[in-house]
Amino acid sequence: MKKCLMILLIVMMYGCQSKEQLNILVPQGSPAMTILGLDQSIYKVDVVNGPDPLVAAFGSGSHDAIIAPTNLGLKLYQSKDLYQCAAIVVWGNYHLVSSRFESFTIDDLNNQDIIVFGQNQTSDIILKHILAFYNITVTITYVDSVANASALYVNNPNQIVMVAEPSLSQLKALVPETKHIDLQTIYQSLHHDQSFPQAALFVHRDLTEDQIRKLIDNLELSIHDVNDEKDDLLSYGVSLGIVNDKNILKNAISSSHLALILALDAKDELDTYIEIILDLNPALIGGSMPDLSFYWSDES
């Protein structure tokens, strides 16, 4: 009898431990860098390619937390509010590259051809917002992905091409004469040092306040350790396929602008970003500014 009770107790304890492990979904690229320092015994992380798995997860509630483009999370929240925005984790990770110029600056863009990924998406909108402010006229050719944009650049580095990390660092390794313009830096100069909140942490409504707070604290520490370029985390990033070389990953981290800021603390930045999107493509975020229920708060 005692033996049966002991077995039952062990099974119950194991079941409790299993439920404590949170499932996180994250897209490949800079967002995947943020999770490299998380304890894998506490967090089960699924790294995916493309937006389709993210859209499916937001609709089904399959994961405890999702790291996703901010605009995608907002748009899907408008139709099904299973997840709240808890924090911003990736800030502005768009870059223009070219090897044609001695010193590549925003002034070099006027009357040029630019290859841009993601027509009518955030990448396109941020670039157009910056160009409009500087009254710069360009001709844009669109491609459907960063990978395709990068391939075109390798084929002809004299072109001006929009990319994102970690592709930027990979291109610099392949084409050492590459110069780049960090659009985040330009954006900040237009908006009183505000950054644009590119990717965010979204948490399922079923999570407890303690679970969310612990996740935020652990993710913040993970990002801190990633920014410190700890060698074991670089190795883990290579094993996840973010890039295939630790030195390239190290370079990519510094240009990815990784930092965790609670969503409510970043509301001014989010409002500015959302207003820009509403002005150029309202459908990208569901057509309206979110109410306060979109933001997770430990005081709610």
Which residues does each PLM region occupy?
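Short, glycine-/small- and polar/acidic-enriched structural segments
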Residues: 21-128, 132-134, 141, 159, ...
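Bacterial signal peptide processing site
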Residues: 17-19
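C-terminal motif of bacterial Sec signal peptides marking the signal peptidase cleavage site
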Residues: 13-15
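Periplasmic-binding protein-like
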Residues: 88-98, 177-205, 252-256, 292-299
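Sec-dependent signal peptide recognition
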Residues: 2-7
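Secondary-structure end/capping motifs
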Residues: 206-280
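Pocket-lining segment of extracytoplasmic ligand-binding domains
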Residues: 145-236
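Conserved C-terminal helix/tail region of periplasmic/extracytoplasmic solute-binding proteins
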Residues: 271-300
